[in-house]
Amino acid sequence: MRCLQVFIIFLLLIPSPPSVDAQRKTKDDVPLASFHDNAKRTLKRLWNKRSCCPREFLCCLR
């Protein structure tokens, strides 16, 4: 059973062939930078909610 787990981990480590992202960009493609900015903004907002003080409940509502 342990060999099966090791085998699955090795399969996950094998590099995969180029995906759809490797295709040429068209004029309709949205740059990934906007997605990364949105993700960073969301994570920052969630982090601020997590680190706010219980006495200052209003900081959690932003």
Curated annotation (Swiss-Prot):
It holds the Pfam family Chi-conotoxin. Coiled coil: none annotated. Expressed by the venom duct. Its main location: secreted. It comes from the Eukaryota. One of its GO terms (molecular function) is toxin activity. Residues 23-48 form a propeptide. One of its GO terms (cellular component) is extracellular region. Residues 1-22 form the signal peptide. Contains 2 disulfide bonds that can be either 'C1-C3, C2-C4' or 'C1-C4, C2-C3', since these disulfide connectivities have been observed for conotoxins with cysteine framework V (for examples, see AC P0DQQ7 and AC P81755). It is found in: Secreted. Keywords: Cleavage on pair of basic residues, Disulfide bond, Secreted, Signal, Toxin. Belongs to the conotoxin T superfamily. The cysteine framework is V (CC-CC). This is Conotoxin Lt5.5. It comes from Conus litteratus (Lettered cone).
